[in-house]
């Protein structure tokens, strides 16, 4: 006993609790068979709580009708069915919306066609008012999209979320005699079309071709600037040329810096005027840069000096687009920082790794030389003590060339008296 509901944001498969709520399930199945829910909007969407649908006109409708009223054989509503075993304890439970009518005994809860779907867990507070008759078996991603919809203060989404089709997968109930299933989905009525806010395929922000072209140009310029920064032609991607520099080209090769400065000085104070020349030959490249103290002077010169004849040559002026000066300044600062960093590194390594200059090395060498001499004195003292202890007479070492028979090949004393003075543990066997 299942129904497939196709919406504008995805599909939902609802399994019905036929045994626990038979009349409610029958009403829902027969309304789906009559295509009553087609084009019904989702409204009253409360984030992480519930969403409501089932009225063909949405929040402006009359609340909907039950299937027996649609077939002109019954009242508009029927009594709500509550089952104590069914509670709102998880996401995806389907319940009927109820209305309260007065009866002779007490107030009575009745149902029509509207239903709600829970969008969160542990909503037991709905048990006393909304009777459960089904649960979502598939399509929880669709529920998440409905839950995340952008809505107004009343919970109605700005972009319409509607039921497109309802397909019955299993129906255990017999159809009423007057129920005739339509051959096709009915077209929406004019009243339903009047409730449309933003359609499914409607663009929220329409972009003209001019805006799209402008956006593409900006993105392309941004990419080119980043590329120039990476290869080193620009100091940084968003660098802008100076506004107080005028570019002059098509100059006569004989035109000098002083000539241009004299001609353009009537438009304002000139900070610098430079004709660009070849680095090797010094010949003029026939263009120059003139830097004024303010932007207004550049604009005056631009409008007044276009195609003016200077030294039999008509010049062309424009606002400068060069950032070479910024690049030179950036490179000089970068090199200065690098050199400072390298000097700091050298100082750090000199102190931490024990690297000294030549003068310090000489001082340490002298210090180590004195220590070595002191060690030599101590070693001679130890040798003297050793000789006295073992009776090793070093005077025999002076008889290297005397041919003394009491000395061995190593000029050591080999007399019997000396041998017996050694400890027995170190005595050689050949002397026994």
UniProtKB/Swiss-Prot annotation:
Reported EC number(s) for this entry are 5.2.1.8
Q: Which reaction does it catalyse?
A: [protein]-peptidylproline (omega=180) = [protein]-peptidylproline (omega=0)
User: Keywords of this protein's UniProt record, alphabetized?
Assistant: Isomerase, Nucleus, Phosphoprotein, RNA-binding, Rotamase
This entry's Gene Ontology molecular function terms read:
peptidyl-prolyl cis-trans isomerase activity; RNA binding
Q: Where is the composition biased (Basic and acidic residues)?
A: 341-366, 373-395, 406-432
Phosphoserine is carried by which residues?
206
Report the locations given in the UniProt record. Nucleus
| UniProt main location, coarse | nucleus
Report the superkingdom from the record.
Eukaryota
Instruction: Give any single GO term for biological process.
Output: regulation of transcription by RNA polymerase II
Which GO CC terms are listed, alphabetically?
A: chromatin; nucleus
Q: What class of enzyme is it?
A: isomerase
Keyword Isomerase, does the record have it?
A: yes
Q: SUPFAM superfamilies in the record, alphabetically? A: Cyclophilin-like, RNA-binding domain, RBD
Q: Where is this region: Disordered?
A: 330-432
- RRM domain: from which residue to which, for each copy? 244-322
| Stimuli inducing this protein | Induced during the meiotic cycle.
PPIase cyclophilin-type domain boundaries? 1-168
This chain's function reads:
PPIases accelerate the folding of proteins. It catalyzes the cis-trans isomerization of proline imidic peptide bonds in oligopeptides.
Q: Which family does it belong to?
A: Belongs to the cyclophilin-type PPIase family. PPIL4 subfamily.
Name of the protein: Peptidyl-prolyl cis-trans isomerase cyp6
Organism, as annotated: Schizosaccharomyces pombe (strain 972 / ATCC 24843)
